[in-house]
């Protein structure tokens, strides 16, 4: 079974197409020639072969260079045709040669670290804030890595001969702070820059176009988009992808084929979902910024469907007060989710480090979905309550916030 890398694959594919078109067709360009409309789901864990010598040669080749085995599939940990379709599609959306999918975003990040560690490049330079578990993985040194935390301006000075990676997240989780990826890539020199693009998605930014060698996604979030699949993926050049495939084979962090199918389907509606949710979020950010019960609103200049805001009252009461919005961790689903980062997503980060990165104890993170914006505002308004106004609040208070604007169409950039 073809995996979609033919006419729509990495080499010799169609002319450059708009993002919306790629989202629908990438990884599927071969289907019509096979008499298919929907992508098939290949659930096989192993594949028959009557030529053991040829199989041995293919396995030896994979062990040597990590290139995907030519010919039919061999074994589920070496690759799966359904997952390969998703990898093809995501790479095209991010503008990279390749993509390698994993069972979760943390499995994907772990594989990146292990690739560099195997080369003796254990030092990582990172900029806070990152997703809480990414922060913990680096800080705790669970995989043998050593991390130096810096401000963006300090990246170049922090590099060492054994630095294998610079890691950033923009917009950042949960503060939505934005970084100049092009300037950071320049500061990295020959050291790979890994940009976590989970919040922005390729609809709003493509880090590879700004010099990032590695683009990380928790595909659980916007790429899947419906809160029913867990996955991670790294979009990158083919050379780095080969090392990632070898690590995936050795450690077993493979993506289930059904998850690969759901992600491929999720990509087809990614642009329209992100733009619609971003429109809702921009409007809610405007209203929150003008609300005297809200101390500060964080909303990125590139737009997006995430809002972070700090309240004067008890943030836990806001969480307890929502009725339409779901009080839950995670993000990027069609329905709206709200959580308290200091209690959940970033609880694992040392409190002083957390606060130093701008994650205050009064900060709430809102993932805006596709509901009607008036219904969402009514729910937020009720959850914020009428008895949580600061003594100094009132007319004339100027909200502290970032610039607010609707996201542009990616095709217009």
Swiss-Prot record:
Pfam families: Cys_Met_Meta_PP (PF01053). Pyridoxal 5'-phosphate binds at residues 75-77, 105-106, 218-220. GO terms for molecular function: cystathionine gamma-lyase activity; homocysteine desulfhydrase activity; L-cysteine desulfhydrase activity; methionine gamma-lyase activity; pyridoxal phosphate binding. Substrate binds at residues 131, 365. Keywords: Lyase, Pyridoxal phosphate. One of its GO terms (cellular component) is cytoplasm. The modification N6-(pyridoxal phosphate)lysine is found at residue 221. It catalyses: L-methionine + H2O = methanethiol + 2-oxobutanoate + NH4(+); L-homocysteine + H2O = 2-oxobutanoate + hydrogen sulfide + NH4(+) + H(+); L-cysteine + H2O = hydrogen sulfide + pyruvate + NH4(+) + H(+). Residues 388-413 are annotated as: Disordered. Its EC number is 4.4.1.11, 4.4.1.2. One of its GO terms (biological process) is transsulfuration. Catalyzes the alpha,gamma-elimination of L-methionine to produce methanethiol, 2-oxobutanoate and ammonia. Is probably involved in L-methionine catabolism. Is also able to catalyze the alpha,gamma-elimination of L-homocysteine, and, to a lesser extent, the alpha,beta-elimination of L-cysteine. Homotetramer; dimer of active dimers. This is L-methionine gamma-lyase.
